[in-house]
Amino acid sequence: MKNIEKLEQSLTYEFKDKNLLIHALTHKSFKKSYNNERLEFLGDAVLDLVVGEYLFHKFAKDAEGDLSKLRAALVNEKSFAKIANSLNLGDFILMSVAEENNGGKEKPSILSDALEAIIGAIHLEAGFEFAKTIALRLIEKNFPQIDAKILIKDYKTKLQEITQGKIGQTPQYETVRAFGPDHLKQFEIALMLDGKELARAIAGSKKEAQQMAAKIALEKLGAL
């Protein structure tokens, strides 16, 4: 593990109890009886509330459904992993040699969980307001333009609304292949419409590849 003081500097928060920070950085593969899963559980709840309250005030005229989509676009593994990478969090996480050799320090799930655990740890030590301040600073730094149109990239829904309205057809998404090692698995998805391939995309998850394919299709249709 690197010097955790560097991580504290990036967080702009110095832990009084260094063991609490180390606890938040301990993956279950390193020590089953002493890992960050409980702190992750707490941090997840804190972040859910922090982001929910933030969006409630920032998008004062938006309906509940739109706010829920916005929160889902921010409170997820991919977004939290991005923030974790900005902190070089993988360098500080304690994990087994086997997990590290399997790409553990780059896994979005592990990075995201560690970030949540750190926020949970700050909440335990300093209270909600401290955790809120730090969480919002990290979110705004990594997502400087928090805009509904940018965050809610639900291209699949938009495409389906267009195709159903114009030709009464629903796009179908077929998995062409899955390839790569387990920790870097890639999926190739073909978007089919009325029996013809309209677009194709590759991404690290089926859902992401489907969204990318839908975006390509929308661009072809001139709907973006």
Curated annotation (Swiss-Prot):
Mg(2+) binds at E40, D113, E116. GO terms for cellular component: cytoplasm. This is Ribonuclease 3. It comes from Campylobacter jejuni subsp. jejuni serotype O:2 (strain ATCC 700819 / NCTC 11168). Residues 4-127 form the RNase III domain. The active site is at D44, E116. Homodimer. It is found in: Cytoplasm. One of its GO terms (biological process) is tRNA processing. Its EC number is 3.1.26.3. SMART domains: DSRM, RIBOc. The gene is rnc. Keywords: Cytoplasm, Endonuclease, Hydrolase, Magnesium, Metal-binding, mRNA processing, Nuclease, RNA-binding, rRNA processing, rRNA-binding, tRNA processing. It catalyses: Endonucleolytic cleavage to 5'-phosphomonoester. Transmembrane segments: none annotated. GO terms for molecular function: double-stranded RNA binding; metal ion binding; ribonuclease III activity; rRNA binding. The lineage of its organism: Bacteria, Pseudomonadati, Campylobacterota, Epsilonproteobacteria, Campylobacterales.
